[in-house]
């Protein structure tokens, strides 16, 4: 289990100066050729998403203005707050900020031939499935994960195991991404 606080994470500026990324975790850890990766991006200007052949990207707008996504003749989509949207990461996707507002989004990328992610918003206590990887990011409220208290802009990632996330207040929202390994693959085989 790895814990993080977005306010304390290192920031990597994009080459095109249109934004910045805070990498949460990758699996396998510290590998450039990852099977899955979670990150938070701040987007300050219109531009294209980086290409990642053989990967799927799920992007969830956390805050800021809506973002219009366009991929030639494949899709046009308006990204709205807390509504995950998946697309192939090997296609050119242009992002246009609405009303010129900066936005912040959560990204999870998975290698299509190894694993698949599912992203959802939780508003009550839940338990993850065992032997699957995952990432949580607190949008608001106070959540208990094991002996650790997680609050706004904090989270955790893990590579396997069963975990209970307990909402400690009447209301709260948490982004949860679960990683499912495809047949013939498991975390034990790739470490």
UniProtKB/Swiss-Prot annotation:
InterPro entries, sorted: RmlC-like_jellyroll, RmlC_Cupin_sf, Uncharacterised_HutD/Ves, Uncharacterised_Ves
Signal peptide range: none
Protein family membership: Belongs to the Ves family.
HAMAP family membership: Ves
NCBIfam families hit by this protein: PRK11396.1 (NF008488)
Annotated gene: ves
Name of the protein in its database record: Protein Ves
């Amino acid at each position: 289990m790895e814990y993080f606080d977005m306010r304390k994470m290192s920031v990597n500026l994009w080459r095109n100066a249109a934004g910045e990324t805070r990498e949460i975790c990758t699996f396998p850890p510290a590998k450039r050729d990852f099977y899955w990766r979670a990150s938070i991006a701040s987007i300050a200007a219109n531009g294209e998403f980086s290409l990642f052949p053989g990967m799927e990207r799920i992007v969830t707008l956390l805050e800021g203005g809506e973002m219009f996504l366009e991929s030639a003749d494949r899709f046009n989509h308006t990204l709205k707050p807390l509504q995950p949207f998946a697309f192939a990461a090997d296609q050119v996707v242009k992002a246009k900020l609405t009303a010129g507002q900066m936005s912040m989004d959560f990204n999870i990328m998975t290698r299509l031939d190894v694993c698949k992610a599912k992203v959802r918003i939780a508003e009550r206590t839940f338990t993850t499935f065992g032997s699957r990887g995952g990432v949580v990011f607190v949008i608001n409220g106070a959540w208990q994960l094991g002996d650790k208290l997680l609050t706004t802009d904090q989270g955790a990632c893990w590579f396997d195991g069963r975990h209970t996330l307990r909402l400690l207040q009447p209301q709260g929202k948490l982004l949860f991404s679960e990683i499912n390994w495809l047949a013939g693959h498991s975390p034990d085989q790739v470490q």
